[in-house]
Structures are given as structure tokens and as C-alpha cells.
Amino acid sequence: MKAFALISLKSCDEKKIIDKLVELPEVQNAYVLFGEWDIIAELNVENSEELGTFMMEKIRTIPEVKLSSTLIVAK
């Protein structure tokens, strides 16, 4: 399943975080954004359980991450 993770950072080192993200097998692409969110990551996971585990164990454990939100692609 495809999903997108919106990520807001405590600090402004987007490149460092994107470099970490793209090393993860679930992350297809990651981009810097301007506005409320700092990064958007395109994700590919097997199911919603794997998505939840990924967000809780791999995204939210990054010390620089202040806030995240997940968007699941419907079609």
C-alpha cells in the first residue's frame, strides 16, 4: 500500500533527515516542503499494521522529529 508521511522537525536540518529516511526500505522518495510541514516521504508498505509499526518505530523515534501525520492513498 502507498502512503505519505508529513514530518515537522524540531530543527531545520532537512537534508540530514532526508538522507536517513531514504536509507529505509519503506521510503520510496522524500522531499523538502515549505510551510507547516518540513518533509514529505512517499512510503510503500504491505498493510496498515506495517505502516503503523513503521511510523512508531522508525519515524517518531528520530530525535529531530517534532510531529508527523500519515496520509494513506485510496486509489
Residue ranges of predicted features:
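A compositional/biophysical signature of low hydrophobicity enriched in polar/charged and small residues
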Residues: 1-75
